[in-house]
């Protein structure tokens, strides 16, 4: 069974439905939240019920599509104070304001901005609501389908690049990799970005371990070297614990050998790992022209530690994450989250005697929030940090892996189209 962050039922074009997995309840509770309006999309994005730059863009675009579907019901439109449907020009103006509102849900993630920019173009070009709805529908379907295809390409590109580099170094042993936050099926339409590379590395390891004559499904080797990834170290990724709650959940689901580690243990884990750690693969919420990258808080320090130990550090993201208008990381607006998201820890209540989740009278796991810091203490809680391009060894995309020139700079112009 594949993991799904987004359920988009398009079997009936005139009656589509969207549900989003509430990732705040994982790993013990699986609950899908229906999306009917832009307000619903804003809420699940802003509260981080859905996260991951590609998934955020998809959910945002789907929320617009769902609101259009409701707008075409005259009764619904007349109940909304922000719409005047007496003319499409007035509706167009209101929709433009609604897109502004939706964009404010997570301003750092460039994928959402890019998707809404495409929708604005469609809005400007459409002669009426029906034409606009058809255009958005086609765009959303293409966005989802291309994301999944590109994720598999990225996974294989990043895995093959690392394996080839290790072969050129003469390294032919088992190895481990690091990752942070969640960049897998739960952050995308499927397979993942950085975690997609991990999936491809694991498939390669299975292929190299497959005995001749094995009757099981044949796996595909990504290169002819003997190096195999045998261990993944996901960081817990405080304060939202996406690594612990989500990435660990995906790795267990896919039966990929993994050991969850504290954010503060990176250096010591590298120094003491029973198998050598040869690379770190991370995702991105925004990559600017020079290669500086905004990603989950903690990515910068992971890159610094990798630099110290000589470990390859790769950013993995689709071309839609490239911001061709911003020159350097200094131009990225970093979102800051509410203090209580740092001072409180939320999760499923566990019975101290049995170690099992506590359940309510409907046999559903009970969620709880506990304080871990004085309520009076000041808090700085940035959602992202900026990793300088100098610390990045390669940027993995669906078009291949981009590395730095002899001068130490990235040339990403081929990705700006």
From Swiss-Prot:
Its recorded reaction(s) are: 5-(methylsulfanyl)-alpha-D-ribose 1-phosphate = 5-(methylsulfanyl)-D-ribulose 1-phosphate
What sort of enzyme, by top EC class, is this?
isomerase
| Major localisation | cytoplasm
- So, what pathway does this thing act in? Amino-acid biosynthesis; L-methionine biosynthesis via salvage pathway; L-methionine from S-methyl-5-thio-alpha-D-ribose 1-phosphate: step 1/6
E.C. number(s) listed in UniProt: 5.3.1.23
- Gene Ontology cellular component? cytoplasm; nucleus
HAMAP family, per database record: Salvage_MtnA (MF_01678)
Family recorded in the similarity comment: Belongs to the eIF-2B alpha/beta/delta subunits family. MtnA subfamily.
**By what name is this protein known?**
Methylthioribose-1-phosphate isomerase
Phylogenetic classification of the source organism: Eukaryota, Fungi, Dikarya, Ascomycota, Saccharomycotina
Gene name for this UniProt entry? MRI1
């Amino acid at each position: 069974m594949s993991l799904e962050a987004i359920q988009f039922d398009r079997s009936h074009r005139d009656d589509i439905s969207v549900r989003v997995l509430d990732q705040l309840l994982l790993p013990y509770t699986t609950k899908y939240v229906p999306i009917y309006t832009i307000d619903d999309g804003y809420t699940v994005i802003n509260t981080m019920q859905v996260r991951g730059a590609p998934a955020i863009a998809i959910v945002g675009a789907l929320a617009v599509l769902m609101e259009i579907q409701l707008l075409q019901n005259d009764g619904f439109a007349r109940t909304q104070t922000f719409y005047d449907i007496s003319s499409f020009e007035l509706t167009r103006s209101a929709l433009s304001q609604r897109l502004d509102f939706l964009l404010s849900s997570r301003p750092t993630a460039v994928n959402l901005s890019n998707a809404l920019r495409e929708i604005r173009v469609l809005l400007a070009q459409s002669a009426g609501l029906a034409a606009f709805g058809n255009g958005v529908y086609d765009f959303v379907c293409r966005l989802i389908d291309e994301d999944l295809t590109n994720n598999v390409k990225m996974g294989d590109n990043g895995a093959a690049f690392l394996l080839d580099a290790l072969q050129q170094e003469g390294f032919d042993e088992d190895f481990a990799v690091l990752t942070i936050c969640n960049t897998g099926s739960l952050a995308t339409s499927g397979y993942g970005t950085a975690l997609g590379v991990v999936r491809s590395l694991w498939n390669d390891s299975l292929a190299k371990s497959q005995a001749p004559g094995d009757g099981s499904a044949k796996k595909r080797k990504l290169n002819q070297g003997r190096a195999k990834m045998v261990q993944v170290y996901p960081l817990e990724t405080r304060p939202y614990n996406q690594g612990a709650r989500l990435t660990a959940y995906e790795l267990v689901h896919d039966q990929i050998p993994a050991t969850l580690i504290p954010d503060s243990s990176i250096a010591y884990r590298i120094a003491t790992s029973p198998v050598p750690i040869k690379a770190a693969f991370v995702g991105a919420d925004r990559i600017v022209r020079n290669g500086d990258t905004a990603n989950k808080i903690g990515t910068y320090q992971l890159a610094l530690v990798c630099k110290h130990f000589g470990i390859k550090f790769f950013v993995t993201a689709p071309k839609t994450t490239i911001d061709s208008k911003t020159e350097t990381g200094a131009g990225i607006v970093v979102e800051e989250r509410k203090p209580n998201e740092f001072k409180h820890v939320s999760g499923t209540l566990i019975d101290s005697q049995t170690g099992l989740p506590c359940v309510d009278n409907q046999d559903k796991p009970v969620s709880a929030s506990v304080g871990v810091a004085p309520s009076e203490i000041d808090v700085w809680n940035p959602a992202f940090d900026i990793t300088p391009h100098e610390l990045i060894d390669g940027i993995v995309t669906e078009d291949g892996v981009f590395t730095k020139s002899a001068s130490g700079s990235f040339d990403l112009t081929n990705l700006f189209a």
